[in-house]
Amino acid sequence: QHTETPITMARTCLESTTGASSSRANPGFLLAAPDAAETAGEVCGFNLLYSGSHYLSVQKSLQGLTRVMHGISPANFNWELAPGERFETPEAVMAWSDAGFGGITDCFGRYVNEALIPPYWKNRPRPIVYNSWEGCMFDFTEAKLLRLGKLAKQLGCELFVLDDGWFGKRDSDTSSLGDYSVNAKKLPNGLKGLGEKLNAMGLQFGLWFEPESVSPDSALYRQHP
């Protein structure tokens, strides 16, 4: 939702300390001239090429200048460098447009397509995706997934994504997140067997991960509490 806040000498901060960004705490913001509109007016946009905990602040100085800080969240963060070592921070990007909010959106869109998207996907239509989550959530077998794959192909889908539940003892959202070994009870032929059968239907095969999270009830957490 579009929210506007005046820039004053009081610092305005946006941050995430949860290890994630996403739509809950996007590390992006705009600085807009008072007369900026959708198609006219000066707008500066900022974003961070990083999906972890982040911090940004905007403040007007005593001289009337706008100061922006943007980067990794300092909360609970430290990194010791030995002599000769280096630490590379996430890249912060800034864009400017005199064509309003629509102009800055287009500017960032061009940047993402030209500089961030893998070369194979530049200016290429994305495949139509079927995701297994709404169809079966954690309750599936290989046979059920293949039935869904057949229906997805009939609907014109091109990529079948197997969502949560394929690993560990993941029968609910209370355990196993982080234990990315195949659940042989659900997938006796493994991911390779399922993928080959979906490929034979003419579907690409994709897989869901949530690498930024871990369940307390998991082997990974017990090994690294």
Task: Label each PLM-derived region with a short phrase.
Residues F108-N123, I128:
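Long, charged amphipathic helices and adjacent flexible linkers at domain junctions
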Residues Q1-V112:
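N-terminal accessory beta-strand-rich subdomains and adjacent acidic, glycine-rich linkers
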Residues W121-P225:
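Aromatic-lined carbohydrate-binding/catalytic grooves of carbohydrate-active enzymes
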